[in-house]
Amino acid sequence: MSPLLKSIIDIIEIFNQYASHDCDGAVLKKKDLKILLDREFGAVLQRPHDPETVDVMLELLDRDSDGLVGFDEFCLLIFKLAQAAYYALGQASGLDEEKRSHGEGKGRLLQNRRQEDQRRFELRDRQFEDEPERRRWQKQEQERELAEEEEQRKKRERFEQHYSRQYRDKEQRLQRQELEERRAEEEQLRRRKGRDAEEFIEEEQLRRREQQELKRELREEEQQRRERREQHERALQEEEEQLLRQRRWREEPREQQQLRRELEEIREREQRLEQEERREQQLRREQRLEQEERREQQLRRELEEIREREQRLEQEERREQRLEQEERREQQLKRELEEIREREQRLEQEERREQLLAEEVREQARERGESLTRRWQRQLESEAGARQSKVYSRPRRQEEQSLRQDQERRQRQERERELEEQARRQQQWQAEEESERRRQRLSARPSLRERQLRAEERQEQEQRFREEEEQRRERRQELQFLEEEEQLQRRERAQQLQEEDSFQEDRERRRRQQEQRPGQTWRWQLQEEAQRRRHTLYAKPGQQEQLREEEELQREKRRQEREREYREEEKLQREEDEKRRRQERERQYRELEELRQEEQLRDRKLREEEQLLQEREEERLRRQERERKLREEEQLLRQEEQELRQERERKLREEEQLLRREEQELRQERERKLREEEQLLQEREEERLRRQERARKLREEEQLLRQEEQELRQERERKLREEEQLLRREEQLLRQERDRKLREEEQLLQESEEERLRRQEREQQLRRERDRKFREEEQLLQEREEERLRRQERERKLREEEQLLQEREEERLRRQERERKLREEEQLLQEREEERLRRQERERKLREEEQLLRQEEQELRQERARKLREEEQLLRQEEQELRQERDRKLREEEQLLRQEEQELRQERDRKLREEEQLLQESEEERLRRQERERKLREEEQLLRREEQELRRERARKLREEEQLLQEREEERLRRQERARKLREEEQLLRREEQELRQERDRKFREEEQLLQEREEERLRRQERDRKFREEERQLRRQELEEQFRQERDRKFRLEEQIRQEKEEKQLRRQERDRKFREEEQQRRRQEREQQLRRERDRKFREEEQLLQEREEERLRRQERARKLREEEQLLRREEQLLRQERDRKFREEEQLLQESEEERLRRQERERKLREEEQLLQEREEERLRRQERARKLREEEQLLRQEEQELRQERARKLREEEQLLRQEEQELRQERDRKFREEEQLLRREEQELRRERDRKFREEEQLLQEREEERLRRQERARKLREEEEQLLFEEQEEQRLRQERDRRYRAEEQFAREEKSRRLERELRQEEEQRRRRERERKFREEQLRRQQEEEQRRRQLRERQFREDQSRRQVLEPGTRQFARVPVRSSPLYEYIQEQRSQYRP
């Protein structure tokens, strides 16, 4: 490789080594330039560490003024330094020797080649000296060879450039990848502080090794390419040389051929030497490259560590510098504003002083003057001066107005920048939180997804970093532009002040000259008049005519002289006016140019903002796409879970089908026995009829009891508060009595059945026992079915509650989303608060004051937080009471179900223990039943656990929400406390107070209307809930639009404040605003709205207190009615349960028979665990018996029955053991026959069941007739049902009350937002009106200025006419005047045109 290419590659590598790689490409920042100058040019520069050196170099190199140094600008630095170095070396004495010594080692081969070429051409010249044709041929040959060599050289250079470019691109790509990977590694290391650090380090080491291997392979490939290229070049050179030799051999004589052969041999030797040297150089290069690679790796490692440290330090320094710069800028802007104000005040004071001096001078001039003409002159001059001061004061006013406008524009730009930065940071934090959430969601997913997410996060972070850099760059440029504008404005102001001073001096000088000139002219006129009078007195009449002619000539001359002087003065005045106008035009042109530039800058910024918005929109769309994918994945997971649920349910259904089959088999077996025992069925029907008769009697008793309870309830309504507990006790006693009667009747039935069974034979006893067991099993199945239906009802209710909870969860999620945004804002504020605290650590006094303020704020916050916590605690207590009430009801229902289940289990177990030794099949069936019940209990336990977990989860989420609300409320109170100090001063303004009063009155009226419409709102609430989501979306859009509108409104308000409020109060407010603007500029709008909301909430709470006092009685009445309705509902439920039991028994007997057959299969599975569960059940029964005091009598009766049953068992056991073998044999035969007679028995059973159903339907119709006869009772039931429905509606209302309160809060929030929007629209209208008024005012001022100019022109024209007319009148008057002193006594004072002109001017300016 040539030294030139090597030096170029070294320059490129050095640049890439120190450059920062962004989206704009590789550029040198100020810090990078500092490091480069320190390390690479430390020996050349005098002071490389000095920041001024870096600033000077940056200003010299940064041609495009973007604060960054590109590669072309870096090359400019290299060329300048090289030029300076060569110039310094050329000045030295030993430059040639150094060059020779330096070139001897490198260019030895080239010198030998040149010497050989010279020898060869000298021989050729000697041979062809006398032959001109040979010379010409030689020249042509040389030119051709040179051209071919040039082409080959160009090819080689192009080839080398191509490969060097490829190599450079690869190196840059690798460096970029390294940088990106380093950044990604840093970020990942930061994120992974505590998790999988060792695995991450190992992965990173593997990745680095892979990268190093890739680099090494790339270098090897590059080296192989270079070798191939060199071989190819050598082959090309050899081929070309062979072709050249062949041509020369053909054309040259033998002697020359010999010479050429010798030369070629010499060249071949040289080439061999060159090849050997190249190989040696290549080996050295390879060794050097390996050493350099090792060094580079070490350096890179060290540099990586250094860069990591430096980056951390840089980030901290940048933050501190940014904060300090912002503080400095703010202080500088503040100082500049104060200086501008002071200058304006000084200018105004100087103008006042000048005016006072001018007035004093004029007064002195007036006092000095004695003649009337001087007074008239002074009056004219004073009026002209007033007009001129008006004319010249206008530019000054315009200048002040332009300064204010510039200041306002600057403040607007600063606010816009701050808001944009806040919005950008907010979006950035939102994106970071979203990425964090995605990472948390996908933490359990495959590593490929993690890599994709990491890559996306890396790209997003790089993009954010680039955007921050661009925004910083733009901010620096804007600040530079603003500083330049301010400097230009200062220069223009100084220039204008100088011009005004010079103009005032010229005006004063002219005024003095004019004051002196009239006195001289009048003295000269007086002398002439005296001479003329003397001549007229003593001259002859002929001479008088001559004298008159001479006087006329003199008058004409004087008039011409005055006119000439007047024209000269007018010409000077015009020139000055034109000069002034030209300056004004130039200034206006410059201002227009500046405005155009500003507009161009604004347009460019707007375009950039639009581009940023588009990019953000694209990012948002990408984010939405990612979220959509995540939602799809979650949906897939839900579908999988649903499929699993369906699979589980399918298995359960299959198990139930198996149980049904078993029960069906059992039923078939029983049906075969039932056909043999038709008589027993008849007896059973009689027993069933008796039971129905008993049930009818019980219903009649219950109806009587209900009537009594209704009467008691009516009595209770009158004395509800005093007798609530008594009524509950009476109801409990009544229920206990009713239950006791039912149990006694059941016991009597059982005793009658047992007596009847004892009377009959043992075979009939066994059959009856089996039938009784069958009936009991049917009853158990019916009860289980009822229990299953109740469970389904509970599950349905639970699903409805879950659906409600899901809706609430969605609302909570939306609330969490809003709260998350608020938390993000609060996090922003917290970070700013931390930065502010770090700043305040340096300022001890401010910290102490702020600590005091914080303590006061904290006390206020604690007080408010305490009140809010009390309110929230009350709400929580209400919610908790509602939950407890609901849970209590569920627990009561569950307890009732458990008691029923336990009683059923006890009865079943008792009977199973009696027949334990008699029937093994019955034991197996019982075991299967217990197994199924165990599974059901386990499922119920699982359901209960799930419900408990859901409740705990809900409670935990509610606690978290409440905690978040508390934190948010505390933070909001802090913000409110901070904003309160600012708002106290703003509320002092009368206009805002009046508007707020009007707005409050209007809001108060609207809230009264809202309170009246609340009942109507309750009916529309369901429809409103459906539209709530759509409204939220629209609200989000409107919030974005409102943000822009509010930003615009805020700008207009600030402009209006700046225009209207010029007093010290506003300056103090602006100073305070500036202190708080860094932290609360974006929140000010929200806090204002929150203040209005708090004010409205306070009034609303006061109104609500009044309304609550009115509604307390209504609520108490509702509470009484609710309790009555609850009692009636319980009674109605009991009635309904009895009715449902009766109806369900008639409808579902067939289904229960099938399920009894299915249950037989389950019983076979339960046989294995019978004994263990029996022991557990016995223990539970003992505990339950100990607990249940009210069932003591029942247990005693059961013990008696058990003793009797035990005696019966002993008697039975003796005979059953004998019959057991027979039964087993029969069962085996029956099992064989069962498969054969399955369908026949099933058909017979169906027929019998149909007959039974008909009988039941007939009896059911009879009972319906009885029910129709009791229409009054039904009406009362309907009345109770209506009351219970109202009660249910009230319960629903109470359950929805919490939701309504939330919706009411949301509605209030929306109403407040609507109120804020209306207020903003009113403010906009007011501001538009003000703008319209200002525009009209400006139009009036413009018209007034035009009118003034027109009047000035007319006045000038009128003055000319007056002067001409006055001149003519003077001439005529002088001709008419007679000689004598009487001429001066009749001076025209009242009738002069000058006096008329003065009077006209006075009338114009008179108020």
Curated annotation (Swiss-Prot):
Keywords: Calcium, Citrullination, Keratinization, Metal-binding, Repeat. Residues 362-381, 396-424, 447-471, 554-587, 1313-1376 have a biased composition (Basic and acidic residues). Found in the hard keratinizing tissues such as the inner root sheath (IRS) of hair follicles and medulla, and in the filiform papillae of dorsal tongue epithelium. GO terms for molecular function: calcium ion binding; transition metal ion binding. SMART domains: S_100. Ca(2+) 2 binds at D62, D64, D66, E73. Residues 1-91 are annotated as: S-100-like. InterPro entries: EF-hand-dom_pair (IPR011992), EF_Hand_1_Ca_BS (IPR018247), EF_hand_dom (IPR002048), S-100_dom (IPR034325), S100/CaBP7/8-like_CS (IPR001751), S100_Ca-bd_sub (IPR013787), TCHH (IPR033200). Pfam families: S_100. Substrate of transglutaminase. Some 200 arginines are probably converted to citrullines by peptidylarginine deimidase. GO terms for biological process: intermediate filament organization; keratinization. Residues 23-48, 49-84 form the EF-hand domain. Ca(2+) 1 binds at D32. Residues 148-172, 218-237, 362-471, 486-587, 1014-1033, 1062-1082, 1313-1407 are annotated as: Disordered. SUPFAM superfamilies: EF-hand. Transmembrane segments: none annotated. Consists of nine domains. Domain 1 contains two EF-hand calcium-binding domains. Domains 2-4, 6, and 8 are almost entirely alpha-helical, configured as a series of peptide repeats of varying regularity, and are thought to form a single-stranded alpha-helical rod stabilized by ionic interactions. Domain 6 is the most regular and may bind KIF directly by ionic interactions. Domains 5 and 7 are less well organized and may induce folds in the molecule. Domain 9 contains the C-terminus, conserved among different species. Homodimer. Intermediate filament-associated protein that associates in regular arrays with keratin intermediate filaments (KIF) of the inner root sheath cells of the hair follicle and the granular layer of the epidermis. It later becomes cross-linked to KIF by isodipeptide bonds. It may serve as scaffold protein, together with involucrin, in the organization of the cell envelope or even anchor the cell envelope to the KIF network. It may be involved in its own calcium-dependent postsynthetic processing during terminal differentiation. Belongs to the S100-fused protein family. This is Trichohyalin. It comes from Oryctolagus cuniculus.
